[in-house]
């Protein structure tokens, strides 16, 4: 049975990757279908109730700069906002919000339902229809066929998902949801490498059974941060505190005593878990010398008594979970509402993807999110936006696009995955970006919004606000460079008391701001130097661009040097055996990874600069040397 309409783009899955993919495609004018097994769970936060953080907040800002929904929903759902690394340099500062699950889901669903060109339909997908290595549609569990030349799969943990609690296990996509068994079996027939990964979640606790007075209160920041470039603090709901407590030796003894019934340590779980978000039993095993581990007690919302104890993800049996929870200070009488569990699921080797997130072997088939081996809402959302955007571009007959490593954390993410692959759930950190001084949270819009507008992702309202902000920054920088103060100026009376060294020669306002003891707000508050910019984000840009100009220029010079051949394309059908001078090891690695560009090839372990030079000479001789847009 065929559905009565044909679509340009079909998105399978309604999590963070799927919603951003569907919205991006629809914003660009493509007739888009979002298929989900349950409309009520669209935008569901399956694990921790938080958005952002180190590296992750940068991705959220980039999604937002390209017109995505995650940051907007967070501003409406965030019940505690903090700026992490606030005492450090701007490159590593990151916004994190504790989010109300229900409010977040509601806002995402509202955005989806009001998006033109987007149809939502409730059916699980069982089959992928492929003809001559070209995807042509999908078939749902009731045999309904939907036709489309592009399909974006955002299946999360649902592919052959298996949930583990102690030695008990059962099939599931997440707690309370069925797995996608038929689709997983169909995908295993494709010429794409497949593996298994694992993730987990902690038990949820009844807040009424917790003694918060025994814990350390953790309040949000004042003034309140805002996640979206078009958001404001008035959108935030009521703000509340989180709390901090710790495990202890008794907790660790309880965990050690239960390891014989742990699916992780008895060989039942084969999938590899996330290195940077390990289970509590993994922490006890790997860091045996530590007598205590921090636990963040995070509320799941304003209208629920559920608490998420961040730091004790576990798949231990329920009786062990209850005992370990009750051994923790403040939770001696705690009641578990939902047990913690681990989930194993299929993922596909991201080295089999182009940097557009289209598979290299099946035209029109795109993967985004945990199916590519990543972990985290933010990583999923960023991939979803890119995949949905590129599916739409492909339908429109236009060239696909992916930011470079020096343009966005999204570029770093995709390049890492498609070039190096991953054997464990991949999460983003600022340390993964070699050009992080240029890839700050605060300038994500300046980096990406113009490109988003060009691609059709950015609406008129966002574009107007962005251009106004960008113009105000440029005009203010011009003013600071063009206004000067002289040693005999009457303004010295208010200025010199604020300086470590008094003015002895003429200096521009920009020179004054560059001094370490001076900041923009202070300078603008002095009579004769203001009034300055009212928009705090624009003012922050001015300060950063002035104070870090030397470092920024140095990094830009490094990029210009590296980029000379970064985008030189490697033809997909290039036979590396025919390239004279390449070693057998290099040939094997290039055939295994199949890099899209010289830049990707250069980052493969074991590929030497000499091998890159040989490739460039070969491409030039054959007239094959061309670059991406």
Swiss-Prot record:
InterPro entries: FAD/NAD-bd_sf (IPR036188), GIDA_C_N (IPR049312), MnmG (IPR004416), MnmG-rel (IPR002218), MnmG-rel_CS (IPR020595), MnmG_C (IPR026904), MnmG_C_subdom (IPR047001), MnmG_C_subdom_sf (IPR044920). Its cofactor is FAD. One of its GO terms (cellular component) is cytosol. One of its GO terms (molecular function) is flavin adenine dinucleotide binding. It comes from the Bacteria. The keyword Flavoprotein applies. Keywords: Cytoplasm, FAD, Flavoprotein, NAD, tRNA processing. NAD(+) binds at residues 273-287. It holds the Pfam family GIDA_C_1st. It is found in: Cytoplasm. FAD binds at residues 13-18. Its main location: cytoplasm. GO terms for biological process: tRNA methylation; tRNA wobble uridine modification. NAD-binding protein involved in the addition of a carboxymethylaminomethyl (cmnm) group at the wobble position (U34) of certain tRNAs, forming tRNA-cmnm(5)s(2)U34. HAMAP family: MnmG_GidA (MF_00129). Homodimer. Heterotetramer of two MnmE and two MnmG subunits. Belongs to the MnmG family. NCBIfam families: mnmG_gidA. This is tRNA uridine 5-carboxymethylaminomethyl modification enzyme MnmG. The gene is mnmG.
